């Protein structure tokens, strides 16, 4: 499996499970820079916006200082 695809699936699963996605932590975990994680976040957001039956949104939560999934 492509590293990027595996990383996006892993990030997706983490946010679906209720985890707060902090870019710096994710970048360190996967050995990439924060820009790569931001692109992954954008891909996950695009997935949710292209699914007409999904009311989910991945958005930044200032209080939690990371990205969370809103239903």
Model features per residue range: what roles?
Residues 1-71:
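Short, basic/aromatic recognition patches that contact phosphate-bearing ligands
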């Amino acid at each position: 499996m492509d590293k990027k695809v595996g990383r996006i699936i892993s990030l997706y699963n983490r946010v679906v499970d209720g985890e707060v996605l902090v870019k710096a932590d994710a970048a360190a975990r996967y050995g990439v820079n924060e820009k790569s994680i931001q692109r992954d976040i954008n891909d996950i957001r695009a997935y949710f916006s292209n699914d007409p039956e999904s009311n989910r949104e991945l958005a930044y939560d200032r209080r939690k200082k990371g990205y969370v999934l809103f239903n």
